[in-house]
Amino acid sequence: MVFASAGAAVSGAILALDLGTTGIRALLFDPSGAVAAGAYREVPQIYPQPGWVEHDPQTIWQLTCEVVAEVQAQSAARIAAVGLTNQRETCLLWDAATGTPHGNAIVWQDRRTAALCQKLRAEGWEAPIRQRTGLVIDAYFSATKLAWLLAHRRPYYPGLKAGTIDSWIIWKLTGGRVHATDTSNASRTMLFNLHTRDWDPELLELLAIPAEILPAIKPSLGVLAETDVRVLGYSAPIAGILGDQQAALFAHGCDRPGLVKCTYGTGSFLVAHTGDRPIRSRHQLLTTVAWSDRTSTGYALEGALFTTGASVQWLRDGLGIIETADESEALAASVPDSGGVYFVPALSGLGAPHWDMGARGLLIGLTRGSGRGQIARAVLEAIAFQTREVTDALAADMGTPLTRLKVDGGAVRNNLLMQLQADVLGVPVERPQLIDTTAQGAAFAAGLGTGFWGDYAELVAARPIDRVFESGERQLVLQAHYAVWQRAVERSREWVR
């Protein structure tokens, strides 16, 4: 992979913007790769009706401006480049002349287009869409969301723009001059042809999405545009655009086949780099772009789990058995095991490797002796078991056994969860000191793309590792429990038909 050469004396900082599902984060990275400043704002979630999830695009932009202003107030360093990473699949429509959105963005978790997805399957589109895009037909992806927006919010007119969250923020950062996305985000829309590396005309026609409303597709790494002077007080290059999971993969140094990372957030996402060619999964994993530069494109296999950290939130908000998410660790550790209780976290259906929109959550094995501790432990074990399902599928598709799992995301602070994960997988689990790895990946991409940093391998190797969890004495017991949990998964399948 080709990067610009670093200058002899590097000064300033790289600004990473992480436009996540639950929050907007800005981090400044100094020349050593350390975090020099940071700011965060929570994104309000909008639930118009059951199964629908939306975000206000204007709020996302306002919060972005706030975190940028805050990190600039914390550090006088001049921003040498901007890197951007974002929640993928979430999409919106807006007016080019005014920059005003046509309603809220539809979030990746939103299931309102499930019926359209079923119709596409019934019409025989499953195999063609899989072959072209590497994805399964699911309401998770942008394609059916955009079709819904055009049908229900605003039909096509000259000057209508559409895009994912990266495109929206690039539009705003550049003062409306640039309408673009990168290959990693485009590959998550179910409209991007992996073989031509462009929007697929037949799929656009199928869903009545005009090509002219979509952003131009650019490399993930390298200078894409310049910020409007009103954003920072001066202009700076936007030089790294990556979907959040690809950004984490980049930060972990997973740039070749056999390296796997898992991000534990609201959902969990396991991604393995597969090299310079797309591999079609035989186990219901997604084929996607890892990242690209001006000369090459790397590919990946991904398993998306819809409900992991959200399961812990359900313990707090739904059952009320904990007051904060952090309490889940102590509560689960207060009992030696789950007491035969198993949890299937299909609260929004099942993602990889099942892709069952009709599956529903299941808590089974309850007796009069079951209490809060057993339920909390069953939830943490279920997160580890789900991850095992996907790592097994990755190993089968790639023909390479998993030897180490690199992890990041808010839930990895839970030491019990990480130990359970190591035991269930039977391999070391590596946790870095900086668990905001998506922002770090965006910073690395922007810095390497502008010559702020010169060597990718050295940059990755310099990241401090906080702890490596080794599989322990409960490995065999938990792997036996995994087999029982798989029976519970089968009971949860196709509950809603």
Swiss-Prot record:
Top class in the EC scheme:
transferase
Residues that bind ATP: 21-22, 266, 309, 313, 410
Residues binding sn-glycerol 3-phosphate are 21, 88-89, 140, 244
GO MF term list: ATP binding; glycerol kinase activity
Q: Where does the signal sequence lie?
A: none
Keywords on this record? ATP-binding, Glycerol metabolism, Kinase, Nucleotide-binding, Transferase
- Record GO biological process: glycerol catabolic process; glycerol metabolic process; glycerol-3-phosphate metabolic process
The EC number(s) attached to this protein equal 2.7.1.30
Which reaction is this enzyme known to catalyze? glycerol + ATP = sn-glycerol 3-phosphate + ADP + H(+)
Regulation affecting activity: Inhibited by fructose 1,6-bisphosphate (FBP).
- What pathway annotation does it carry? Polyol metabolism; glycerol degradation via glycerol kinase pathway; sn-glycerol 3-phosphate from glycerol: step 1/1
Pfam families, per database record = FGGY_C (PF02782), FGGY_N (PF00370)
Annotated positions binding glycerol? 88-89, 140, 244-245
The positions annotated for binding ADP are: 21, 25, 266, 309, 410, 414
- Entries under PROSITE patterns matching the protein: FGGY_KINASES_2
Q: Name one GO cellular component term.
A: cytosol
For this protein, the record's NCBIfam families field holds:
glycerol_kin, PRK00047.1
Q: What does this protein do?
A: Key enzyme in the regulation of glycerol uptake and metabolism. Catalyzes the phosphorylation of glycerol to yield sn-glycerol 3-phosphate.
Q: Which HAMAP family match?
A: Glycerol_kin
Q: Which family does it belong to?
A: Belongs to the FGGY kinase family.
Please identify the protein, giving its name as recorded: Glycerol kinase
Species annotation: Gloeobacter violaceus (strain ATCC 29082 / PCC 7421)
